[in-house]
Amino acid sequence: MASSDIQVKELEKRASGQAFELILSPRSKESVPEFPLSPPKKKDLSLEEIQKKLEAAEERRKSHEAEVLKQLAEKREHEKEVLQKAIEENNNFSKMAEEKLTHKMEANKENREAQMAAKLERLREKDKHIEEVRKNKESKDPADETEAD
């Protein structure tokens, strides 16, 4: 388009900016369009070029498939590692809980045995004291009977 095809008409002028209108003149029939209306024709490809493009596409597909398989293998390996770690942590927790419970049970058993031994000792002491009191009473009783006569 030439500059004579365009007319500029000023609408407003303000401090914040300027507004204008562009008026395009109608196109003349003689003018040739600046761009082609249809896309450019592609040259005919030879059989070798088509074959090369197909081979390149096949290589891209294979490369993409290999990359996807590699990512899947890495993901599976990571999942196995995470699962193994979880199993190991669970086993460690179970062992620690079992050891703690065993230790607690042993401490309770020892405490119970100590309490039983202390009770038995107190009972023996009471029996001994009762026996002493009985002997003392028996030894005093015959003397009291002879004195009473």
Curated annotation (Swiss-Prot):
Residues 41-140 form a coiled coil. The modification N6-acetyllysine is found at residues 9, 100, 119. Residues 4-145 form the SLD domain. The keyword Coiled coil applies. The keyword Transcription regulation does not apply. GO terms for molecular function: tubulin binding. The modification N-acetylalanine is found at residue 2. This is Stathmin.
